[in-house]
């Protein structure tokens, strides 16, 4: 079952976030549990976090800078040990309920990139940008 998270779920969300962080290319940057919970508390109020028995997805509504009337549901994090597609569909359903005109997902720049590219293309998505990070530390 997939449901909207509440403030009572913040510890579980932080646990899942720690698992995701340890797997991700961001793992070299320390995971801050308290800040994660504070951020996710705001997201519960102003966006959405959806939970399943095996994972989570979180995101928010975002107007495109070049056309603010064009509002999309932007995925900020998505982590599941299984049934990840069900979370994706639930996020899309949430976005549709909010009246968005599109969805934006990202994928980690890791060994799963090609697999995720295939998943997104099969789900009707097209690549619109690629992100890069430069550490100054």
Model feature map: region roles:
Residues 38-51:
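A short helix-loop-beta-strand connector motif used in the catalytic cores of GNAT acetyltransferases and
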Residues 51-62:
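Conserved beta-strand in the GNAT
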Residues 72-84:
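A short, internal acetyl-CoA/4′-phosphopantetheine-binding micro-motif in the GNAT/acyltransferase core
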Residues 64-74:
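A conserved beta-turn-beta hairpin within the catalytic core of GNAT-like acetyltransferases
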Residues 117, 121-137:
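C-terminal "cap" of GNAT-fold acetyltransferases
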Residues 1-30:
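Short amphipathic alpha-helix that is part of the acyltransferase structural core
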Residues 86-102:
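Conserved acyl-CoA
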Residues 104-116:
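Conserved beta-strand-loop-alpha-helix junction that forms the acyl-donor binding cleft
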């Amino acid at each position: 079952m997939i449901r909207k998270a509440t403030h009572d779920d913040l510890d579980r969300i932080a646990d899942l976030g720690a698992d995701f962080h340890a797997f991700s290319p961001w793992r070299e940057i320390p995971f801050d549990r308290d800040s994660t919970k504070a951020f996710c508390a705001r997201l519960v109020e102003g966006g959405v976090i959806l939970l399943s028995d095996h994972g989570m997805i979180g995101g928010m509504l975002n107007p495109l800078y070049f056309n603010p009337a064009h509002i999309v549901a932007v995925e900020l994090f998505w982590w599941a040990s299984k049934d990840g597609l069900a979370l994706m569909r639930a996020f899309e359903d949430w976005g549709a309920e909010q009246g968005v005109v599109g969805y934006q997902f990202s994928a980690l720049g890791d060994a799963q990139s090609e697999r995720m590219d295939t998943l997104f293309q099969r789900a009707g998505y097209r690549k619109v940008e690629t992100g890069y990070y430069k550490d100054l530390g």
